[in-house]
Regions:
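Intrinsically disordered, low-complexity regulatory regions
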Residues: 1-98
Length: 98
Protein backbone atom coordinates (compact mmCIF):
# COMPACT_ATOMS: atom_id res chain seq x y z
CA UNK A 1 0.00 0.00 0.00
CA UNK A 2 1.41 3.37 -0.96
CA UNK A 3 1.52 6.32 1.41
CA UNK A 4 -1.24 7.98 -0.59
CA UNK A 5 -3.40 4.85 -0.29
CA UNK A 6 -2.74 4.72 3.46
CA UNK A 7 -3.85 8.33 3.84
CA UNK A 8 -7.00 7.60 1.85
CA UNK A 9 -7.71 4.53 3.98
CA UNK A 10 -7.09 6.56 7.14
CA UNK A 11 -9.79 9.03 6.06
CA UNK A 12 -12.18 6.18 5.22
CA UNK A 13 -11.72 4.61 8.65
CA UNK A 14 -12.17 7.93 10.46
CA UNK A 15 -15.34 8.64 8.47
CA UNK A 16 -16.70 5.17 9.28
CA UNK A 17 -16.00 5.77 12.97
CA UNK A 18 -17.66 9.20 12.85
CA UNK A 19 -20.78 7.72 11.25
CA UNK A 20 -20.97 4.96 13.85
CA UNK A 21 -20.47 7.52 16.65
CA UNK A 22 -23.34 9.63 15.26
CA UNK A 23 -25.66 6.61 14.99
CA UNK A 24 -24.89 5.40 18.51
CA UNK A 25 -25.40 8.87 19.98
CA UNK A 26 -28.72 9.15 18.14
CA UNK A 27 -29.83 5.78 19.51
CA UNK A 28 -28.41 5.87 23.03
CA UNK A 29 -27.68 9.52 23.81
CA UNK A 30 -24.31 10.98 24.73
CA UNK A 31 -23.64 8.76 27.74
CA UNK A 32 -19.87 9.32 27.59
CA UNK A 33 -20.33 13.08 27.96
CA UNK A 34 -22.80 12.61 30.79
CA UNK A 35 -20.40 10.31 32.62
CA UNK A 36 -17.52 12.73 32.05
CA UNK A 37 -19.59 15.65 33.34
CA UNK A 38 -20.64 13.69 36.42
CA UNK A 39 -17.27 12.17 37.33
CA UNK A 40 -14.64 14.33 35.63
CA UNK A 41 -11.62 13.38 33.53
CA UNK A 42 -10.96 10.10 35.33
CA UNK A 43 -14.23 8.84 33.84
CA UNK A 44 -12.63 9.09 30.41
CA UNK A 45 -9.99 6.56 31.38
CA UNK A 46 -12.43 3.80 32.30
CA UNK A 47 -13.60 2.83 28.79
CA UNK A 48 -10.05 3.17 27.46
CA UNK A 49 -8.78 0.86 30.19
CA UNK A 50 -11.55 -1.66 29.50
CA UNK A 51 -10.84 -1.64 25.76
CA UNK A 52 -7.09 -2.04 26.33
CA UNK A 53 -7.77 -5.04 28.56
CA UNK A 54 -10.00 -6.53 25.88
CA UNK A 55 -7.37 -5.88 23.20
CA UNK A 56 -4.68 -7.52 25.32
CA UNK A 57 -6.84 -10.61 25.79
CA UNK A 58 -7.69 -10.81 22.10
CA UNK A 59 -4.05 -10.50 21.06
CA UNK A 60 -3.08 -13.19 23.58
CA UNK A 61 -5.53 -15.51 21.86
CA UNK A 62 -8.48 -15.27 24.23
CA UNK A 63 -10.91 -14.84 21.34
CA UNK A 64 -14.66 -14.88 21.38
CA UNK A 65 -17.30 -14.87 18.68
CA UNK A 66 -18.45 -11.27 18.97
CA UNK A 67 -15.33 -9.13 19.41
CA UNK A 68 -12.39 -8.61 17.08
CA UNK A 69 -9.02 -6.92 17.36
CA UNK A 70 -10.03 -4.49 14.61
CA UNK A 71 -13.30 -3.50 16.30
CA UNK A 72 -11.53 -3.03 19.62
CA UNK A 73 -8.90 -0.77 18.04
CA UNK A 74 -11.69 1.29 16.44
CA UNK A 75 -13.39 1.51 19.85
CA UNK A 76 -10.15 2.76 21.41
CA UNK A 77 -9.79 5.40 18.71
CA UNK A 78 -13.40 6.57 19.15
CA UNK A 79 -13.13 6.77 22.92
CA UNK A 80 -9.85 8.67 22.58
CA UNK A 81 -11.49 11.27 20.34
CA UNK A 82 -14.51 11.49 22.64
CA UNK A 83 -12.16 12.00 25.60
CA UNK A 84 -10.29 14.72 23.70
CA UNK A 85 -13.56 16.51 22.91
CA UNK A 86 -14.57 16.49 26.58
CA UNK A 87 -11.15 17.77 27.64
CA UNK A 88 -11.41 20.58 25.10
CA UNK A 89 -14.93 21.43 26.28
CA UNK A 90 -13.76 21.48 29.89
CA UNK A 91 -10.87 23.76 29.01
CA UNK A 92 -13.12 26.07 27.01
CA UNK A 93 -15.64 26.22 29.85
CA UNK A 94 -12.85 27.30 32.19
CA UNK A 95 -11.41 29.77 29.69
CA UNK A 96 -8.20 27.76 29.32
CA UNK A 97 -6.23 27.26 26.13
CA UNK A 98 -4.67 23.89 25.31
Amino acid sequence: MTQEEKIERFHEIVNEMANLYAKKNANYGDSFSKLYNDLGPMAGLVPLHNKLDRLTNLIKGNHNDFESVEDTIRDLACYSVMFLIELENSSNDKGENN
